[in-house]
């Protein structure tokens, strides 16, 4: 794969990720303040089912198809019809399941919400084939641009609906808009009209790897459904709303960086023959992910008490420890999981399935532990997040032979600098008046502190990062004339 194309994509992804992080930092607390824990709790009852079904609808074919030549029309056409059928069948299944779930949860308003969200399952299946084509072509920047565009428009829609008093429907509208715009944008970039053929023998080899991916996602989705049920039963709708919002906000923020970098690693690993080259890219992307996610989540954790008071509102005051522990632990855990892209590119899915099963079981145990109640819950879940990431790196050591210490060294500097920045933000937060304005000042001041600490504590790697960025920018400027006609 062209290093020039890879560098150009990395620059675009970096810019898009920065904008997405800023968007999430502003949007999530604003929606939480406008909607309150109860609306988030109602949405959280529907969300695990939707995410669970989406995992099945994907069928794991997206990652597997990226390894297939685009000239093989029998495979691509058969995959398209298979995915479309799955989307329709599973969407109908979601609508039918909403009735029994509303009775079990004693929430009569749940069926129309889930019926509307069922459309997002079909929209997801329409993005899988073009996504696989773009991955195979190495057009990783398209994912970032499409995702940023969809998130901006969907976020604006959610805010508008929330201000109009739409309640939980603001979150429903955001989800449908997000998946709808992704489907439109990605198909506009890489749609190919499928033939009216279906050959199971042609597509079945992809279901082997896809089946392993689905099994891993199935285990994760089932675990989160049970997890939501346990939290809701123990702490009520408001507690579930706080728990679900914190986990979803942290996940969205971190995945805004980890998804594109994981896609970048997978796209390169699929076509690369040199293992050392893939390993080097993995370490660089681990560094990039750490540089972006660790400071953001650390500062949020440091200012969690100010965030709940000034932005989320008094109804969220009991969620301070959740925010303070879930955000940074999610970022650290995700760093370890980045290596799964390289493992999937080799066609190995079993280890990731077992990892997902272990994570789901541990998270379920964490939320079910009675000792300590609500105050202890964040500590248990944070420990599972960290253990999940570390175990993923250990699996990479066993399967790929990559040293654990190398990945930890790439994240060490950003982690230490993030701790310094978080301490500075906390000190400012303690010594400044209340209100959103001073909260923003405290968070913004952590930025230059982070950069200075990074330079002092990890100078060699930081200078190398700066050199790599300048090289990438130079390649980005050179990309347009090279990509055009001679």
Where are these regions (language model features)?
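N-terminal membrane topogenesis motif
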Residues: 1-24, 66, 73-78, 108-110, ...
């Amino acid at each position: 794969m062209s290093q020039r194309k890879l560098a150009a994509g990395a620059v675009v992804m970096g810019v898009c990720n920065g904008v997405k992080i800023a968007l999430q930092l502003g949007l999530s607390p604003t929606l939480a303040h406008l909607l309150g824990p109860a609306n988030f709790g109602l949405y959280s009852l529907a969300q695990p089912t939707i995410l669970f079904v989406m995992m099945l609808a994907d069928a794991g074919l997206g990652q597997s198809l990226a390894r297939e030549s685009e000239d093989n029309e029998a495979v691509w056409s058969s995959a398209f019809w298979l995915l479309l059928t799955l989307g329709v069948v599973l969407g109908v299944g979601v609508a039918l399941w909403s009735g029994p779930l509303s009775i079990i949860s004693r929430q009569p308003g749940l069926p129309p919400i889930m019926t509307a969200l069922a459309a997002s399952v079909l929209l997801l299946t329409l993005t899988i084939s073009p996504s696989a084509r773009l991955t195979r072509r190495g057009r990783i920047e398209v994912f970032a641009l499409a995702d940023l565009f969809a998130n901006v428009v969907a976020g604006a829609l959610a805010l508008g609906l929330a201000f109009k008093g739409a309640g939980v429907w603001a979150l429903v509208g955001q989800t449908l808009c997000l998946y709808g715009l992704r489907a439109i944008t990605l198909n506009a970039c890489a749609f190919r009209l499928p033939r009216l053929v279906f050959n199971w023998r042609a597509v079945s080899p992809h279901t082997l790897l896809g089946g392993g991916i689905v099994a891993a996602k199935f285990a994760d989705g089932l675990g989160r459904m049970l997890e939501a049920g346990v939290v809701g039963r123990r702490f009520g709708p408001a507690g579930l709303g706080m728990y679900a919002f914190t986990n979803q906000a942290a996940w969205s923020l971190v995945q805004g960086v980890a998804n594109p970098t994981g896609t970048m690693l997978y796209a390169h690993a699929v076509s690369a023959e040199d293992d050392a080259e893939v390993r080097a890219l993995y370490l660089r992307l681990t560094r990039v992910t750490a540089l972006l996610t660790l400071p953001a989540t650390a500062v949020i954790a440091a200012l969690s008490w100010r965030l709940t008071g000034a932005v989320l509102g008094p109804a969220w005051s009991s969620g301070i420890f959740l925010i303070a522990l879930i955000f940074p632990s999610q970022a650290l855990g995700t760093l370890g999981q980045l290596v799964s892209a390289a493992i999937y590119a080799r066609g190995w899915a079993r280890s990731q399935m077992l990892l997902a099963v272990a994570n789901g079981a541990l998270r379920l145990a964490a939320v079910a532990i009675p000792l300590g109640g609500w105050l202890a819950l964040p500590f248990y879940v944070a420990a599972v997040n960290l253990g999940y990431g570390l175990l993923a790196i250990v699996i990479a050591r066993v399967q790929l032979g990559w040293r654990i210490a190398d990945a930890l060294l790439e994240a060490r500097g950003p982690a230490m600098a993030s701790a310094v920045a978080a301490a500075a933000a906390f000190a400012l937060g303690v010594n400044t008046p209340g209100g959103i304005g001073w909260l923003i000042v405290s968070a913004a001041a952590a930025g230059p502190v982070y950069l200075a600490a990074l330079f002092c504590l990890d100078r060699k790697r930081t200078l190398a990062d700066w050199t790599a960025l300048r090289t990438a920018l130079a390649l980005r400027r050179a990309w347009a004339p090279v990509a055009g006609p001679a």
